[in-house]
């Protein structure tokens, strides 16, 4: 566990053979927010640390970028500990989760939707990260100016607790057709991202980025 930026805690695992780092985040505010659960094994590992940080507070929201085991594989573990937690996800993910046995509260969001709570204001950005290039979500917390990028802006290497510096526009320009294999959707996404002005990119994998 690392305090990566202001009230943002990072929980990570590095997989040496792949030189790949997987992160989850806890944004500490009046309504605490978890970004990604990790796999079931990761969730069971980080849950005691999260409970310690919350000091009796209830976990209010879990943000899920897209349907993948490292994003939402541990949902049931968190729902068991926090039965009223609300999973915030894409419309596709909201339809799929019950089919995998998840019966918790779900809130579906899409491009330009907002979610305001105690201590946070979230804006949602569509990006084609779900099966068959359907839209998943990235998240922008407007008060802290943190952009949660999901799998959009990833790098390889041991990035546990580490940050790097870069320019926001350069990070957007680096999103290519290998990442988003549809030119039209890529252009729409890049135009949408240029409307934001984050101070930090909290990546799903790799080094968090402090924006110059």
Which residues does each predicted region cover?
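Short, basic, glycine/proline-bearing loop/turn elements
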Residues: 60-62, 119-122, 170-177
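Short catalytic-loop micro-motif centered on adjacent basic/acidic residues
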Residues: 33-36, 61-65, 124
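Metallo-beta-lactamase
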Residues: 88-211
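Active-site metal-binding motif and surrounding structural segment of the metallo-beta-lactamase
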Residues: 42-88
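Short, glycine/acidic-enriched loop or turn micro-motifs at the edges of active sites
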Residues: 39-40, 69, 154, 208
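Conserved beta-strand hairpin/beta-sheet module of binuclear metal-dependent hydrolase folds
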Residues: 2-51, 137-150
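Hydrophobic/aromatic beta-strand patches that form the interior of the parallel beta-sheet core
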Residues: 9-11, 63, 88, 125, ...
